[in-house]
């Protein structure tokens, strides 16, 4: 039977590999196979719930970038929260780039926001930058609507990191939050809750967003220092 790695190489697109390697400066190009995401998603759907997939999910660490992406796609499909969390927590330390991190969106989180919160608190305090980035993205994805609490943006603001992709996710969170809850989020930009870099990047992202109305964009531009 063809191994998963062999299957991934059978889908290799050399042109896409070269292009994608340029988007992933922190990843050794030799670890990038060059599989387009639609093909990887189709493969994940076909592989899911097979004995081969179950074995693959226990085989960490992986060698290739696409193997980690496939791992994320398989985990995401799990509908039971309790079943998902142990293998997810084993996988989070393997996140080593923004793309795999941002791909990982478990479907069962939307129905388990109360159960997820203690994990988010733990991940926000982790010393691994992509675990922290993942936690902030989950707060952005699931807790800006009906499940919002004023405590959540405070938790994101409290994250202290010099890692570029953590700070970018903080800015993305606050720019998105402005579209949902402008009056509640604006004080984070008028005060000193955010680092100057995150503050300026938040304003930039918000001004560029199609979800922010013109009058709010004008107010945000006036806050630039």
Q: Where are the regions that the model predicts?
A:
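Alpha-helical scaffold domains
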Residues: 1-225
